[in-house]
Amino acid sequence: MASDSDLLDTKPAETRHPEKAHRPDQPTLRKPDWIRVRAPGSPEWAATNKIVKEHKLVTVCEEAGCPNIGECWAKKHATFMIMGDTCTRACAFCNVKTGLPRALDRNEPQRVADAVAKLGLSHVVITSVDRDDLSDGGARHFAEVIAAIRSLSPKTTIEVLTPDFLRKPGALEIVVAAKPDVFNHNLETVAGKYLGVRPGARYFHSLRLLQRVKELDPTLFTKSGIMLGLGEERQEVLQLMDDLRSADVDFMTIGQYLQPTKKHHAVARFVTPEEFNSYAEIGRAKGFLLMSSSPLTRSSHHAGEDFARLKAKRQALAPCAEAGQ
């Protein structure tokens, strides 16, 4: 089994996160047994890793230090992170490298499409770093990646996990017009924690973005996720759930925050599996089509299976909606 240190970034925080170098080390909590996972290394994992490297692609699985990488890559599931490995934001929780990104690689959409075809994916998740340096925040690049995948793998369903496109008018419309099957944008934490956890973002802007997706294309599934263990109160989480339902979000994910390095935001506590289960029950009662809530839940974990469940839920509810008209 992987130790606590196995799940921490092995590169110095000063290298990947220069803006955090001056920060004092934050306290660390020992992980409970329910957080521990097996270290990756299966032959199937190695095969996925080989395809990713051959196509010179970046995955959020690696960059964010996802604890589920061994399980997902063994199933040939990978979440591709486009537009480079360097983010223009500096969120207190995130392990993705920060700094000044390079120019966009115009060949990347085709390389991603080639990898999706080679892996034989039935469902793929595409995410990105924040690119505040680009006039459209990278929206056109998202659209080009979607088009390239559709061209090579027309039966593959596509899920995008986007940045907030803050102060990028028209960017959201470009991505929605490209017709992904699922549009995911994570709130990450409750409103009261944004200043300390996600200072470059705005809670109500992110909510409005999710609401706007449904206004632009009601057929798209919308999705959002948060982390627990950042010091939030239960009532704040329940309010966030209500906010997401008001924005007509279909699917919510809730997982445990894990501290990447001692320079990152401290883990306030490890939330028990029973508490995660209670949030799932409450979310279903509030009207989400689907809830995924557990310590190791991540946005892209079991994304393909979840998409199939989402479609089935919507189809099951359709006759009820028609009867009520």
Swiss-Prot record:
One of its GO terms (molecular function) is 4 iron, 4 sulfur cluster binding. Residues 8-31 have a biased composition (Basic and acidic residues). It comes from the Bacteria. Residues 73-289 form the Radical SAM core domain. It catalyses: [[Fe-S] cluster scaffold protein carrying a second [4Fe-4S](2+) cluster] + N(6)-octanoyl-L-lysyl-[protein] + 2 oxidized [2Fe-2S]-[ferredoxin] + 2 S-adenosyl-L-methionine + 4 H(+) = [[Fe-S] cluster scaffold protein] + N(6)-[(R)-dihydrolipoyl]-L-lysyl-[protein] + 4 Fe(3+) + 2 hydrogen sulfide + 2 5'-deoxyadenosine + 2 L-methionine + 2 reduced [2Fe-2S]-[ferredoxin]. Keywords: 4Fe-4S, Cytoplasm, Iron, Iron-sulfur, Metal-binding, S-adenosyl-L-methionine, Transferase. It is found in: Cytoplasm. InterPro entries: Aldolase_TIM (IPR013785), Elp3/MiaA/NifB-like_rSAM (IPR006638), Lipoyl_synth (IPR003698), rSAM (IPR007197). Binds 2 [4Fe-4S] clusters per subunit. One cluster is coordinated with 3 cysteines and an exchangeable S-adenosyl-L-methionine. HAMAP family: Lipoyl_synth. This is Lipoyl synthase. The gene is lipA.
